[in-house]
Amino acid sequence: RQNHYFMRITFRSEEGQSLEDLRKEFQPLVDKYKMEFEFFDERAKRKVILMVSRFGHCLNDLLYRWGIGALPIDIVGVISNHLDFQKVVEGHGIPYHHIKVTKENKAEAEAAQMRIVREAGAELIVLARYMQILSDEMCQQMSGRIINIHHSFLPSFKGGSPYKQAFERGVKLIGATSHFVTADLDEGPIIEQDIVRITHAPVSYTHL
């Protein structure tokens, strides 16, 4: 939005106020300057639903990190358009929801996915190699609540085969980007990024 200032602050309350107390104390400033605000407790685990298709490396990494307590989240379900990882997910005691997605039933499939999200009380959806482009309607309904991990240093090399694109362009760095999902493919606000350097060593396209 134009003519808006956005700010995110992390702080610790030495007096131990509750979130409700902080909201009440902050409200006069909100009214005075016509601000929009939200308070979140960093210690509270976010309820998350993962979405995956047929590549399991992201899913397995998230499940492992969640299992050892390395992620401050509560995985309340996994949604997939395939059955490949049902046993893996249910072995962790997590509900697995198989919803087949085709061009013909995409609207109905997304409506079913949204019902699962609402019923589970999930605050976030994480796309762990979910190989379907979400509709504009779903992106709008879940604005700011869907996270994608794209395997390039955005805004470079959007879309499919980003490593191949990077290799053909001859770049010396490749990266990964976590971003919020919007209706524009790989264009959402960036959350975090990381990079690694690459060499001139021969690389097989099968690994890109």
Question: What are these model-derived regions, one by one?
Answer:
Residues 66-75:
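A short alpha->loop->secondary-structure connector
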Residues 74-82:
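Short internal beta-strands
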Residues 206-207:
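Conserved small/polar residues in nucleotide/adenosyl-binding loops
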Residues 81-87, 134-135:
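Short, glycine/polar-rich helix-capping loops at beta-to-alpha or helix-loop-helix junctions
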Residues 59-67:
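Histidine-anchored nucleotide/phosphate-binding helix
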Residues 83, 161-189:
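Short, glycine-/small-residue-rich phosphate/pyrophosphate-handling segment
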Residues 1-44:
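A conserved regulatory-domain signal marking ACT and ACT-like small-molecule sensing domains
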Residues 104-105, 109-165, 169-172:
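Rossmann-like adenosine-cofactor binding region
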